Regions:
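C-terminal accessory helical subdomains adjacent to catalytic cores in phosphodiester-
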Residues: 1-11, 20-41, 45-167
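Helix N-cap/beta->alpha junction signal
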Residues: 15-16
Length: 167
């Protein structure tokens, strides 16, 4: 039996600590090769209005910067030009409660990423207006932990009680 290489499948840019926690949970429990990126490990939130600063930062600015940072991404070559495979994705998970309607539309439609080299790989995921609302609408139980006046974090994927006979 031959081993196949396990390439990085996606990069997820997270709004804040709760989104990072959710992505880390998925990465760990489903054992998916993804890189979870956030500002200061989720301590500082990324807004719709500032996401381009991240994409124009040292990790994402150019294709070369990207493949230098994320060395285990699968690259295909056509003649002399290098590309990421069509299976690779950059997911950007952000709240839409901190921007105006035009910025929100530009994020959701990908218009704000049009001139970035990674445009074809970017897939915006938006919480309308924030993650709490989405979890509530989806009937996903969570606990809100207030850290201080303007900051809180969510604890979700709470264990559910076992039904008799299940282990």
């Amino acid at each position: 039996m031959t081993k196949t290489l396990s390439y990085l499948k996606a990069v997820v840019i997270c709004h804040g600590k709760s989104e990072k926690q959710m992505c880390d949970f998925i990465k760990s429990n489903l054992r998916i090769r993804i890189a979870v990126e956030s500002d200061k490990k989720g301590e500082k939130s990324i807004q719709v209005t500032s996401v381009m600063k991240i994409l124009n930062g040292r990790k994402f600015k150019t294709f070369q910067d990207f493949i230098t940072t994320f060395e285990d991404v699968e690259i295909c070559k056509i003649k002399t030009k290098k590309f990421l495979t069509d299976d690779f994705k950059i997911f950007i998970i952000l709240d839409t409660d901190d921007c105006n309607e035009a910025q929100k539309k530009a994020f959701i439609s990908k218009e704000m990423f049009r001139n970035h080299w990674a445009y074809r790989y970017i897939f915006p995921i938006y919480n309308n207006p924030q993650l709490e609302s989405v979890l509530t609408k989806s009937h996903i139980k969570f606990e809100k932990r207030v850290m201080h006046e303007n900051r809180s974090t969510l604890k979700f994927f709470l264990p559910t009680p076992n039904i008799k006979g299940e282990k």
